[in-house]
Regions:
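Short edge beta-strands and adjacent turn/loop segments
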Residues: 41-66
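Post-signal peptide N-terminal segment of mature Sec-exported envelope proteins
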Residues: 26-46
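A short amphipathic beta-strand at an alpha->beta junction
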Residues: 87-116
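Short, low-complexity, Pro/Ser/Thr/Gly-rich segments in the mature regions of secreted, periplasmic
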Residues: 116-130
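Short, non-transmembrane amphipathic alpha-helical segments
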Residues: 71-96
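C-terminal motif of bacterial Sec signal peptides marking the signal peptidase cleavage site
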Residues: 13-16
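Positively charged n-region of N-terminal signal peptides that target proteins for export
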Residues: 1-4
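Signal peptide cleavage region of secreted peptide precursors
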Residues: 18-27
Length: 130
């Protein structure tokens, strides 16, 4: 009898510890930002933060650009193609890709505070093509 009372308790306990993929994405984004940001990616680019936008199922990366790269003359088509390739090649986000998450990248100017130089959203349709 005690055995049968224990089984539902364990099931409820384990279920309460289970974290959905969306909850995990939100938690990991907050942890990444807190532990790593701002993080210098290159001489001209800094990763400022990462968020998870539950309503659009999107992992969103925010960057600042400085120096000679801080210009509106970015080749947006080429930049998007490189970001798509990066997503395709990234193994650390495989679980998110397999579950159809979107990925967004926003690059801000450092010299013109608040100015968006590049704002790209990449969907599963784009990163799942060959």
């Amino acid at each position: 009898m005690k055995k049968y009372l224990f089984i539902p308790f364990v099931a409820v306990f384990l279920a309460s510890c289970h974290e959905s993929l969306e909850e995990r994405a939100e938690r990991e984004a907050k942890e990444f930002t807190k532990k790593n940001c701002p993080m210098k990616v290159s001489e001209y680019v800094t990763n400022d933060s990462m968020t998870y936008e539950k309503d659009s199922h999107t992992i969103h990366y925010y960057y600042s650009i400085k120096g000679k790269a801080d210009t509106t003359a970015l080749d947006k088509k080429q930049a998007k193609a490189e970001l798509i390739k990066g997503i395709k090649d990234a193994t650390g986000i495989r679980n998110y890709k397999e579950n159809g998450f979107n990925f967004a990248y926003t690059y801000y100017s450092t010299k013109n505070k608040g100015q968006i130089l590049l704002d790209v959203k990449i969907t599963p349709k784009e990163y799942n093509t060959k």
